[in-house]
């Protein structure tokens, strides 16, 4: 062992004597190496081994050396730690990040998956990729958009934040240069499905508006009245008050309107026959038409006590149009009688019609009065007591006399009135002449018999038509409501 040790020592330091020197030199070399920071661990071990053998001064030196070594090592360790783990020192401090949030969205290229700083916008399809991918794709000779495979005419270069991408529908990804254009695209392409719904809802809304008129006859009737205003202004005024009564027959309202429109033509055709009595007859006819009760009242005068029964028989005998008409309003009444007379030959059928009408009319007119103005019935009885002829004769004079003043302005037009008189001339005048030829003078003479009898038979009509007759005392109770209704229109 010793020999081998000596050999080893000799090899190391060329002699056993030099072994100590070698050992001494080793630490020096190690120190030099320590300066180089090569092997700190073996030095410590060797110094520890040398400590007991060395003298106290050697110990002091070793201590000093150790202190330096430790110092050096500590320094080295600190630097090494800083280099290896710099975070340990700096992460102990609070860091304030300065800057502002950027609201500009960042889009990613569908080709390379990287965020796009400069867009390559395909022109007609408006899809975007990063400019590099777009140029590469174009250089390859592909004139198709990689996203939608649409042909590409050119590529636009756009900066980040200058494009607005559609994200309403996943996969659209079309880009626009302004928010307005993007919104227009959304409304045109993506909201189209919703638009039909809105349009349908609007259409549904409009139809309901039309039905209400049918449901509310008053509204539905009002427009026709306006149309008729030009032809029959007074009748229109009269129609305004009665609408509340018109609730009963909706279908009848529609029919009367049509009838009203149709008869005027017939009436216009009819005027030529008798114009001599056109004014008087016209006025009488208009009043009769407006009330429609005048003809039945005449018949009623013949049948003294029909007032109570009329309500019941009226529905059965009366034509649906007639019933609806009385309820509708005076204008309707005026027109329907014309219709009844107009369809048949003016002279002959009218006469026959009034004749059958008395029973029917007796019921119907009363029904009309019961529905709209019952007073005529009550007022009619006193005049009914006198001979029917007187009532009939008185009726025409009343009609003739008052119309000259107030009615002409109300009716405002002979054209409409002319046709009814023709129809009525055969009906009313022949009847009057047939019943009592002597009574015809009273008709012409409004002062004689007319004043007393006018109120009774024509009670219901005058309130709407003539201010004078209704004002007369004979018809105070029943007619006052009607007068209140119609006065505003005439005044």
UniProtKB/Swiss-Prot annotation:
Pathway in which the depicted protein is active: Protein modification; protein ubiquitination
Region (Disordered): 1-61, 255-491
Post-translational modification remark: Phosphorylated on tyrosine residues.
EC number: 2.3.2.27
Entry keywords, A to Z: Cytoplasm, Developmental protein, Metal-binding, Nucleus, Phosphoprotein, Transferase, Ubl conjugation pathway, Zinc, Zinc-finger
Region HYB domain: start-end pairs: 148-206
Localization annotation: Nucleus speckle; Nucleus, Nucleoplasm; Cytoplasm
Zinc finger motifs (RING-type), residue ranges: 109-149
Task performed by this protein: E3 ubiquitin-protein ligase that mediates ubiquitination of several tyrosine-phosphorylated Src substrates, including CDH1, CTTN and DOK1. Targets CDH1 for endocytosis and degradation. Associated component of the WMM complex, a complex that mediates N6-methyladenosine (m6A) methylation of RNAs, a modification that plays a role in the efficiency of mRNA splicing and RNA processing. Its function in the WMM complex is unknown.
Protein name: E3 ubiquitin-protein ligase Hakai
Protein species of origin: Homo sapiens
Chain's gene name: CBLL1
């Amino acid at each position: 062992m010793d020999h081998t040790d000596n050999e080893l020592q000799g090899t190391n330091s060329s002699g056993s004597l030099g072994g100590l020197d070698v050992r001494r030199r080793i630490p020096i070399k190690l120190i030099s190496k320590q300066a180089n920071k090569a092997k700190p661990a073996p030095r410590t071990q060797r110094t520890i081994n040398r400590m007991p053998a060395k003298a106290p001064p050697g110990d002091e030196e070793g201590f000093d050396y150790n202190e330096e070594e430790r110092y050096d090592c500590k320094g080295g360790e600190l630097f090494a730690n800083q280099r290896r783990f710099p975070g340990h020192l700096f992460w102990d401090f609070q860091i304030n990040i300065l800057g502002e949030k950027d609201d500009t969205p960042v889009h990613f290229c569908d080709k390379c998956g990287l965020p796009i700083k400069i867009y390559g916008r395909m022109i007609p399809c408006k899809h975007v990729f990063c400019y590099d991918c777009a140029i590469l794709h174009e250089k390859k000779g592909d004139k198709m958009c990689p996203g939608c495979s649409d042909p590409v005419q050119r590529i636009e270069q756009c900066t980040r934040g200058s494009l607005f991408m559609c994200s309403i529908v996943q996969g659209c990804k079309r880009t626009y240069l302004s928010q307005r254009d993007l919104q227009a695209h959304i409304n045109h392409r993506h909201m189209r499905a919703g638009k039909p719904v809105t349009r349908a809802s609007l259409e549904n809304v409009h139809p309901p508006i039309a039905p209400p008129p049918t449901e509310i006859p008053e509204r539905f009737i009002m427009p026709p009245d306006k149309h008729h205003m030009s032809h029959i202004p007074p009748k229109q005024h009269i129609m305004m008050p009665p609408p509340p009564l018109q609730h009963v027959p909706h279908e009848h309202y529609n029919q009367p309107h049509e009838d009203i429109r149709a008869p005027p033509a017939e009436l216009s055709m009819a005027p030529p026959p008798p114009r001599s009595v056109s004014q008087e007859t016209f006025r009488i006819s208009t009043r009769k038409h407006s009330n429609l009760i005048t003809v039945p009242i005449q018949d009623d005068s013949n049948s003294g006590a029909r007032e109570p029964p009329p309500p019941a028989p009226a529905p059965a005998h009366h034509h649906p149009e007639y019933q609806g008409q009385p309820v509708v309003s005076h204008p309707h009444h005026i027109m329907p009688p014309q219709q009844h007379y107009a369809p048949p030959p003016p002279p002959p059928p009218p006469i026959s019609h009034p004749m059958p009408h008395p029973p029917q009319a007796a019921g119907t007119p009363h029904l009309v009065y019961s529905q709209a103005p019952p007073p005529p019935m009550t007022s009619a009885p006193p005049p009914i007591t006198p001979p029917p002829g007187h009532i009939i004769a008185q009726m025409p004079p009343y009609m003739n006399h008052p119309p000259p003043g107030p009615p002409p302005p109300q009716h405002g037009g002979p054209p409409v009135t002319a046709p009814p008189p023709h129809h009525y001339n055969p009906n009313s005048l022949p009847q009057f002449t047939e019943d009592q030829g002597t009574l015809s003078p009273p008709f012409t003479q409004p002062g004689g018999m007319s004043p007393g009898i006018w109120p009774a038979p024509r009670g219901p009509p005058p309130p709407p038509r003539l201010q004078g007759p209704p004002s007369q005392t004979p018809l105070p109770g029943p007619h006052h409501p009607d007068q209140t209704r119609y006065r505003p229109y005439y005044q």
